[in-house]
């Protein structure tokens, strides 16, 4: 039996990943990847947790909400069918989905992009504000461009 305790940072990253794609396939190890259904957003995170096996979650937001019901939750992997979420005297079984029915799973290997023309830092608060504005105005994409020394989103 393997036990995993998700850090706050990992939970925050997974919450962000759930806005990119509602489904996710976790691969054995410490790296988690997601890709949008339109394949225009790809994200990768390496956390301190090591997942003992591959498993798929169909609704990542629901999974994270379930974890939030527990005090100091621990994920216990004892079977390939489900994970036990335990905290205090409470526990719940969360069944994995078939990886074949997840909406879109990220490639297992790294994607090599050509060199960058523009580099910048974007805080998580700014990204959340942009995502909120995008949702309010029903805009599916954000565009980043640079013109005469001015960077614009």
Report each predicted region and the residues it spans.
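Charge-dense, extended regions
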Residues: 100-102
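DNA polymerase processivity clamps
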Residues: 1-97, 113-153
């Amino acid at each position: 039996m393997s036990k995993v305790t998700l850090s706050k940072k990992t939970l925050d990253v997974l919450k962000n990943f759930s806005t990119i794609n509602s489904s996710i396939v976790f691969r054995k190890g410490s790296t988690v990847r997601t890709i949008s259904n339109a394949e225009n957003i790809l994200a990768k995170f390496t956390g301190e947790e090591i997942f003992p096996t591959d498993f798929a979650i169909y609704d990542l937001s629901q999974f994270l909400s379930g974890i939030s019901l527990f005090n100091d939750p621990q994920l216990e992997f004892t079977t390939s069918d489900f994970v036990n979420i335990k905290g205090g005297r409470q526990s719940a079984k969360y069944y994995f989905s078939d990886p074949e029915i997840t909406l879109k799973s990220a490639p297992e290997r790294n994607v090599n992009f050509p060199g960058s023309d523009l580099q910048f830092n974007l805080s998580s608060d700014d990204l959340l504000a942009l995502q909120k504005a995008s949702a309010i105005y029903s805009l599916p994409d954000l565009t980043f461009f640079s013109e005469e020394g001015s960077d614009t989103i």
